[in-house]
Amino acid sequence: MQAYDDEIVGTALASNVLALADRVRTADGVEALSEQHRLALEHPGLRAHHLVVTDPAGAVVGYASVLGSSVEMLVDAAHRGEGVGHRLAEAALAVEPTLAFWAHGDLPGAAQLAEAIGLRRVRELWHLGRDLAPAGAGGDEAALLATPLPGGERLRTFGGTEAEEHAWLALNARAFASHPEQGAMTLEDLRVREGETWFDPSLLWLVHDDGDGALLASMWLKVPDAATGEIYVLGVDPGAQGRGLGRALTDRALDVLRARGVDRVELYVEGENARARALYEHSGFTPVAVHAQYGIP
């Protein structure tokens, strides 16, 4: 077992782990690492701790990423049943005994390992999706963005200034105060995402009150390829809840993605967030998969 602090993960190790993640995704039919943990591997400085298991030839066959209060693990399908997952879990808990383990796709092997080390299911993340019909009349993106929201709120796109970054982070922290990952985003986390190839400032929207100009909400869209879009982050200030901003922004997002030729939209939502799930179900989203987190009961 080898352990690496964030600052000493080399390019070769990162490449080997990402190759392992690709093999695991192919074997299991689900992404093996979340974006957050993948970025922590690719960008030293995002406060992660990395654990690696190699075979006698030096090939990476197991990996765990400890980031904040959570850990994600992956084991090469050809080496399952050899105790690799158990070794990684024990090593991760030695780093932080109260860690919670993500099981992407909530596969049986992950659930069995969690039970074996005394953990219980404590959280669910729902992956939802829907298809989009081609854009019809009125599908011009510029016109859609220029049109005020139903309550008169003004929508503008992100300009990339430091003031906007800090304003967005403050809104994000308020909107996701109870969310252990999203609500803890830092300026460095935001800027790493701004540097990703998929980032498009015209798809990060800031919604201001038409009266005092206060930042009320934000919609961040992600289009990783021409056919697929994602409602990446939808945040509404708690003081602006009940104004219909979430639904209005979701409708606007679907219209803009449709205008761009996207034919499939996906998103992730907390399983216990019944209000958000109802919003998305009303907008035509249906379950694709459920990711589970296991922790101390």
UniProtKB/Swiss-Prot annotation:
Gene3D superfamilies xref list: 3.40.630.30
Sequence intervals crossing the membrane: none
Keywords: Acyltransferase, Repeat, Transferase
GO MF term list: mycothiol synthase activity
Catalytic reactions of this protein: 1D-myo-inositol 2-(L-cysteinylamino)-2-deoxy-alpha-D-glucopyranoside + acetyl-CoA = mycothiol + CoA + H(+)
GO biological process: one example: mycothiol biosynthetic process
Function of the protein: Catalyzes the transfer of acetyl from acetyl-CoA to desacetylmycothiol (Cys-GlcN-Ins) to form mycothiol.
Family from the record: Belongs to the acetyltransferase family. MshD subfamily.
Protein name: Mycothiol acetyltransferase
Originating organism: Beutenbergia cavernae (strain ATCC BAA-8 / DSM 12333 / CCUG 43141 / JCM 11478 / NBRC 16432 / NCIMB 13614 / HKI 0122)
